[in-house]
Design a protein with these regions (language model features):
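Zinc-dependent deaminase catalytic domain
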Residues: 1-155
C-alpha cells in the first residue's frame, strides 16, 4: 500500500499536469480533489466555454500625451473577472456529478485565494496541499481558521 507521501506526490503530479491545460498566461493553475471514497476530480483555471480562451486583458500606461493623442505602452496582463479558479472548477464538476467533498483532500499548484478557501471550507474539505504560495496568503489563513489541514508540498 502506498504511503501518504507517495499519494501526495502522485496527486500533486496530476495537479501539475492539469495546470498545463490552462490557457492562462499569467498563471496556469491545476487542482485535484480526492474524496474519502477515492473519487478523483480535476479542475483548471479557465473561462466558461462560450467566453473563449483568453483569460487575461492587457493593461496599459500612458507614457506621453500631446493634445488628444496619447502614446500607450502595454505594461502587463490582468486576469479577467470572469476567470473561474481551478478549485471552483472542480467544485462545479462535483456539484454536477453529485460527488461529496466532505473529508476530501485538494491538491493545487497555487495556494487558494480567500474566495476559493471559503468555498472549500463550505463543502467540507478536510485537507489542502499546495505547491506554490499565492502572493496573498489570506486564503491559507481562511483554511486554517476553518480547521482545515494546510500543507505546502515538498515532494
Amino acid at each position: 500500500m502506498a504511503t501518504q507521501k507517495e499519494l501526495d506526490k502522485t496527486y500533486m503530479d496530476m495537479a501539475i499536469a492539469m495546470s498545463r491545460l490552462s490557457k492562462g498566461i499569467r498563471a496556469k493553475v491545476g487542482a485535484v480533489a480526492v474524496t474519502k471514497n477515492g473519487v478523483v476530480v480535476v479542475g483548471v483555471n479557465g473561462l466558461p466555454k462560450p467566453l473563449g480562451n483568453e483569460l487575461e486583458d492587457k493593461t496599459y500606461t500612458i507614457i506621453s500625451k500631446f493634445g488628444e493623442n496619447a502614446k500607450l505602452v502595454c505594461d502587463g496582463l490582468k486576469s479577467k473577472n470572469t476567470v473561474i479558479h481551478a478549485e471552483t472548477n472542480l467544485l462545479v464538476k462535483c456539484a454536477r456529478e453529485g460527488v461529496s467533498m466532505i473529508d476530501s483532500t485538494v491538491y493545487t499548484t497555487l495556494s487558494c485565494c480567500e474566495h476559493c478557501a471559503s468555498m472549500l471550507a463550505s463543502v467540507g474539505v478536510k485537507r489542502v496541499v499546495y505547491l506554490d504560495e499565492y502572493r496573498c496568503t489570506k486564503g491559507i489563513d481562511v483554511l486554517k481558521q476553518c480547521n482545515i489541514e494546510v500543507e505546502k508540498f515538498n515532494g
